[in-house]
Amino acid sequence: MKRTFISLLLTITLQAWAQDSIEVVNIENPAVQAYMADSTYYYNDDCDLTVITKYTNCDLYGERLDRPAGKSISWTPTVASDNIAEIRITLSEHSDYSDSLTHSPTSTKGTSYLITNLLPNRIYYYKAEEVHTDSTVALLDEGKFRTVGQVRMIRVAGSNNVRDIGGWPTSFGVPIRYGKLFRSAHLDEVTPEGYHDLVENLNVTAELDLRGLFRREPHLKASRMGENIDFIRIVADSYGLSSQREKYAQALIWIISRLREGKSVDWHCGVGCDRCGTLSFLIEGVLGMSEVDLCRDYELSSLKGHKRYRGHVGFRKLLPWMKNHWPDTDLTQCFYNYWIESGVSEADIEYLRSVMLEK
């Protein structure tokens, strides 16, 4: 018995040591890391103070602050670029590369690549391969790393301000699940590379467009990403919790229906801030996010340069409106009441929570 216990303890110690020896990759870019760690961030009903402006400096934090950090890999080509048909990067949470994702740099002349759109708290295995014009394959690089962080920004070539709403803590004691619901700017100009990352790798096959006709061709009734995308346009105004109840309820019911079909959903307006931000606020609220985190998430869009601070004339009214309508109720219940009174069924809300809250 003693020997068995010692062996078990040794195994656990070796496993912990092995994990600690793996390269750690934070999925959050430096600006997001600093913003999320800022302990001076708090909530007040006036929403008159913000810290996000300290983290929008591109000279300090780099360009494209709405994009994630990732794992950088590099290699030395084995043949001339004219003889390379494709550079193929394979990523998996399994050492045998089962259930893998692929990435293909757009140029065969490159010697480096940034692997992004990672989930946090995972161990990933990767390999970079050179596929030659004669169909032979050469291994360029391989290894493993583990990820940390919370905010999962998504790189989609041809779009911006894309985020997975997962990872935020909730009043239910578990975080929101990653990989199901996404928010973004418009998807009209997504490139083939962006399509591969968003649709094929992330399974985003349902698109909800909140823009009005003046922001989009009136005749367009399908996704620009192709006919295989389940598409709907629900024209909604920003921040109108009372006037837009019917629109938001229609949107949530549609989203839940797509989740029931096993699809991941992206909703967007033009730049992914106002209409998109309002719907995100309402969904995240009923999933149990706190006042502070609802504000934090809204302000993340400022990292794209859109200056959507929580003191924005529209957003700053949202939380007080909720709390004033149900003054003797906790915040999560306020959002629940809002959706029920807007026409969403209890069964739909419970299904949303069952899918979107980590077990």
Regions found by a protein language model. Name each.
Residues 8-9, 281:
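A periodicity- and composition-biased signal for non-globular, repetitive helical segments
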Residues 9-18:
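Hydrophobic h-region of N-terminal signal peptides that target proteins for export
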Residues 18-266, 278-359:
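Cys-dependent protein tyrosine phosphatase-like superfamily
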Residues 1-4:
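Positively charged n-region of N-terminal signal peptides that target proteins for export
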Residues 271, 275-276:
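Ser/Thr-glycine-rich phosphate-binding loops at phosphate-binding pockets of nucleotides
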